Amino acid sequence: MKLVIQRTSGGKVEVEGKTVGEIGPGIMVLAGFGKEDTEQLPESKVWNTLIDKMIGLRIFEDEEGRMNRSLEDIKGDILLVSQFTLYASCKKGRRPSFTGAAAPQLASDLFDRLIADVSQKAPAKVATGQFGAMMNVDFVNWGPVTIILDSKDFV
C-alpha cells in the first residue's frame, strides 16, 4: 500500500460533474494498492501503523511556524482518493505499465476497508472519491507539504 499525503486548506472530488466528497483544512490522501498487498493486509500491524501515521503526522504549523501539530491537533478533515497509478512503472518506453497494481476487486475491497478504518480514528470529517471512476480532484496543496508512506518501509 502506498499513501501520498498532502496538507491542504480544502478540496473536493467530482464525478460526472457532481461533488462526491469535500473537505476543509486537513489532508488529501491518494491511496494505492499493489500486487504484494493481500486481503490480510487490514489485519496486519503495518495497516494500523500507516493509518496512525497518516492521522498523527505533525505536518501542521504551531504558533511559532514549526510543523508541530497533527491532524488530530487541528481537528482536520481527510479526503481519501483511490489511485492505482501510484504503482506505475516507467522503466520501459514512454507508456506507464500498471502491472504492479493490485487487481481491481481486491483494491476496491482494501480501499473500502481503509475508508472504514480511517473513519473510526479520524478526528473530523472523512470524504472520499469514487473507486474506479474518472474523477476531478481539486485541492490546494498547502505549503506545499507532501509525504509518501509505503507499507514496504514498515515491514
From Swiss-Prot:
Its EC number is 3.1.1.96. It is found in: Cytoplasm. A motif (Gly-cisPro motif, important for rejection of L-amino acids) lies at residues 143-144. An aminoacyl-tRNA editing enzyme that deacylates mischarged D-aminoacyl-tRNAs. Also deacylates mischarged glycyl-tRNA(Ala), protecting cells against glycine mischarging by AlaRS. Acts via tRNA-based rather than protein-based catalysis; rejects L-amino acids rather than detecting D-amino acids in the active site. By recycling D-aminoacyl-tRNA to D-amino acids and free tRNA molecules, this enzyme counteracts the toxicity associated with the formation of D-aminoacyl-tRNA entities in vivo and helps enforce protein L-homochirality. Homodimer. It is an enzyme of class 3 (hydrolase). The keyword Metal-binding does not apply. Keywords: Cytoplasm, Hydrolase, RNA-binding, tRNA-binding. One of its GO terms (biological process) is D-amino acid catabolic process. Pfam families: Tyr_Deacylase. One of its GO terms (molecular function) is D-tyrosyl-tRNA(Tyr) deacylase activity. One of its GO terms (cellular component) is cytoplasm. Coiled coil: none annotated. A Gly-cisPro motif from one monomer fits into the active site of the other monomer to allow specific chiral rejection of L-amino acids. This is D-aminoacyl-tRNA deacylase. Transmembrane segments: none annotated. InterPro entries: Daa-tRNA_deacyls_DTD, DTD-like_sf. It catalyses: glycyl-tRNA(Ala) + H2O = tRNA(Ala) + glycine + H(+); a D-aminoacyl-tRNA + H2O = a tRNA + a D-alpha-amino acid + H(+). It comes from Maridesulfovibrio salexigens (strain ATCC 14822 / DSM 2638 / NCIMB 8403 / VKM B-1763). Belongs to the DTD family.
